[in-house]
Amino acid sequence: GFVISKHRRLSRKKSYENLLIGGPTGSGKTTTLLFKTICNLENCSLIINDPSGELYHLTSGFLSQTRAIKTLNFSDSSKSSGFNPLERIIKQTDCHKVAEMLVASQQKGHGGGDPFWGLQSQALITLFIQLLLYQEMKYRNMANLVDLVNWFASAPKAIDRIVVKAGDAKLLSEYKALISFPQRTLQNIVASVKASLKIFTDDEVAKVTSFDSLNFAELRKAPTVLFIHNSVGDQRYFSTLNAIFFEQLYGYLLSELPDKDALDVFFVLEEASSLYIPLLPLALANLRKYRSGSIICT
């Protein structure tokens, strides 16, 4: 279980109920508690938010003897596993969730405005995600979602043809409803969508999200440690990606109770106060039923 002092630790079952660690910088939270917890937890998978990379350097060599080690770094594609949010879209609800998070992250801190623009931005993003899913697998990524929006703004007739070619009557009907808005209104919606997708114009982000090498199902089957390396200073910039990643991961873990042979999954969220994870309160309240627990370190 989680280590709570030099000679004490929680039981595995009690660790499902989460642990909050607080203390000033230099108080030994990382080296005294987190390091020991990470090295002593066995027969499980770990998701570790490690902005500074300190935990990776302290533990990855030891952990690699018995577990698969992966990293997720949105600012450095050469050191990162791939994470494509579109890879996990199975039904229309999943499209709506991704679109909602993209728009909500962009509007965070700007409450009180007309909800019309946010709702229509979500509708347009949802529509274009669905359109991408009709294309070959290699084209289904966030950079191409940005391209679709840009083509829609500059060459709408090309998008008309792609929509018709998809052969989806419902999609075509929704597209017709969208383009029926007055030109000025449509331009404002597109501008709002571009702002929501701006992060994916970053070359490194585009590369990391162009493919997917993170299989959430493997977390329950084989001991795996995933280190998330995005510096504290970059958390606001990558807030959209963090929100989508944790939304999809928590959603997967909460989708069904694990069988008796499945591995536990634990989270170590260093510098948790800098993360934007809308689903975190709900996840903390419910994950114990799914044999998962979290250390929240502030």
Regions found by a protein language model. Give the residues of each.
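P-loop NTPase motor domains
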Residues: V3, L10-G293
